[in-house]
Amino acid sequence: MASFATHLVVVVTMLFVAMASAEMLQDVCVADLSNAVKVNGYTCKDSTQITPEDFYFKGLANIAATNTSTGSVVTGANVEKLPGLNTLGLSMSRIDYAPNGLNPPHVHPRASEIIFVLEGQLYVGFVTTAGKLIAKNLNKGDVFTFPKGLIHFQKNIANSPASVLAAFDSQLPGTQSLVASLFGALPDDILAKSFQLKHKQVKKIKLRYAPKK
């Protein structure tokens, strides 16, 4: 059985082949996460202060607890967790699913995504701007890609856990969950009109999604 390390190599290799690399003006630009100033990203850390830890992250090695309301957990390895990714235009994440768990419809506004199934069976798909659903059942070892900015999802269709590794062509892809974003931010009347719901129905749904501060 292929090792976890082998799976990581496969996903990273796929990403490097697919992505268009940006031209850098220095060897590295480790993100200075302590600097509040941002110009389309993080400023560079003093090169004399760079350490191996800036390029290292072990958070994808373990299965995350999936006892959430949707039955899925995303563990990200982006520039905020791995400062050495700054300006490199790539990142990864691991998604773990409980039996029948769902990674709800969401978008990544700044990146395309490619996933590699570590374990389990998934039903995954995305929706085009023309409203067409592109979806497929996946098994262990399968690969699927989601174009930048399009609504997509993954659902575990088995009665056993599932896991995937995902790679992105951005060091900070961003994630916007549709339901949480809409019902956590928009006014009641906008939601009621858009979804043809009664105001009391909107209020009931909004109780689950606290607005962002």
Curated annotation (Swiss-Prot):
Glycosylation sites: 67
Residue ranges of domain Cupin type-1 in the record: 58-203
Signal peptide bounds: 1-22
InterPro entries, A to Z: Cupin_1, Germin, Germin_Mn-BS, RmlC-like_jellyroll, RmlC_Cupin_sf
Protein's cellular compartments: Secreted, Extracellular space, Apoplast
Single GO molecular function: manganese ion binding
Alphabetically ordered keywords of this record: Apoplast, Disulfide bond, Glycoprotein, Manganese, Metal-binding, Secreted, Signal
Disulphide linkage map: 29-44
UniProt keyword annotation of Disulfide bond present: yes
SMART domains in the record: Cupin_1
Cited Gene3D superfamilies: Jelly Rolls (2.60.120.10)
Residues given in the record as Mn(2+) binding sites: 106, 108, 113, 152
Gene Ontology cellular-component terms listed: apoplast
Pfam families (UniProt xref): Cupin_1
Primary role: May play a role in plant defense. Probably has no oxalate oxidase activity even if the active site is conserved.
Stated family: Belongs to the germin family.
Subunit structure: Oligomer (believed to be a pentamer but probably hexamer).
Protein name from the UniProt record: Probable germin-like protein subfamily 2 member 5
Organism, as annotated: Arabidopsis thaliana (Mouse-ear cress)
